[in-house]
């Protein structure tokens, strides 16, 4: 499937950071999981991920920081805006999620797959079932009251699925939050990775408004 020539900048990206949601229970296909692992193995090296088009959102938006809450931790999200379309491909996650260790080294733990609801329903029909991968439905991040049809982050509703390919998650491979990792090493990571800079680990709570910036790849 041909990918769109436009891409949503990192400020347009928001994960399901407000709650843990239920997903389908069909068994994941080992072949798809193996394909996802094989495709993302090289991204343990962040420089390789960045050369492939992934990047940390800019300072001042929730996903610039190490995302955590009492249920567990996600980590830092490196996002590839060129992949934000209606294509669902286990070998091309829209985001890579890294967790810091105590020394500030970042380790690839999860991949995240994202599809915006509007384009998905334009292609598959209004009310169409959500995207699915690995036998699991994506979870919808829905419109929020008072945000003119957008999510709490003032971007259009979207579907997401976290997959902990590289770090065991006691809450389940497809749960957004992993209680076995933390953001305790985030400050040390900020000292090692200039992409991070000065950060504070925080919950991506229902606060703030972030504009959705869209540009062409040539702009």
Which functions belong to the PLM regions below?
Residues 1-3, 16, 35, 40:
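Intrinsically disordered, low-complexity sequence elements enriched in Ser/Thr/Gly/Pro
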Residues 1-11:
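Bacterial N-terminal signal peptides that target proteins for export
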Residues 10-21:
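Bacterial N-terminal signal peptides
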Residues 22-28:
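Signal peptide processing junction and immediate N-terminal pro/mature segment
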Residues 28-219:
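Primary mode marks residue(s) on the alpha4-beta5-alpha5 output face of response regulator receiver
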């Amino acid at each position: 499937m041909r990918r769109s020539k436009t891409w949503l900048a990192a400020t347009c990206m928001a994960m399901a950071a407000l709650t843990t949601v239920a997903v389908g229970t069909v068994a994941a296909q080992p072949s798809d999981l193996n394909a996802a692992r094989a495709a993302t193995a090289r991204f343990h090296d962040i420089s390789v991920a960045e050369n492939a088009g992934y990047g940390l959102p800019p300072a001042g938006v929730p996903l610039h920081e190490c995302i955590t809450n009492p249920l567990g931790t996600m980590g830092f999200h490196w996002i590839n805006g060129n992949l934000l379309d209606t294509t669902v491909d286990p070998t091309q996650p829209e985001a890579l999620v890294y967790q810091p260790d105590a020394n500030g080294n970042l380790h690839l733990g999860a991949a995240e797959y994202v599809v915006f609801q509007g384009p998905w329903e334009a292609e598959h029909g209004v009310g169409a079932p959500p995207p699915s991968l690995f036998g699991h439905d994506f979870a919808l991040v829905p419109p929020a009251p008072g945000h003119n049809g957008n999510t709490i982050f003032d971007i259009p509703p979207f579907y997401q699925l976290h997959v902990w390919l590289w770090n065991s998650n006691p809450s389940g491979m497809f749960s957004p939050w992993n209680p076995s990792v933390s953001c305790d090493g985030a400050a040390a990571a900020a000292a090692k990775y200039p992409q991070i800079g000065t950060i504070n680990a925080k919950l991506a709570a229902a606060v703030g408004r972030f504009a959705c910036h869209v540009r062409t790849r040539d702009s």
